[in-house]
Amino acid sequence: MTASGAISISVGVTYVNSSGGVLALTLANAGTAGTIKIITMTTAGNNAVITPANFSAGTTLTMSAVGHTATLLFNGTAWDVLSVGAGSTLTAIA
């Protein structure tokens, strides 16, 4: 992805390129529990802020450098974090 918008839930892996500016990305709920989504930053320059519709681990996930990766699992209600690569940050629910 090179522009702000919705991350596809129909493909397993999304590659993020923020060299053109800050990205505001959304992630809708998956239709099926057990869906796994991997998001990885392949080209950096700016932050990519990901806001899932329902996120059990916080409110947003921010990536800012090449290699930042998150693996998420949809539990039927919300996205759970299976793993977050070094440097990626979660914003806790206030």
Annotate each language-model stretch with its function:
Residues 66-76:
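Extracellular disulfide-bonded cysteine-rich modules/repeats
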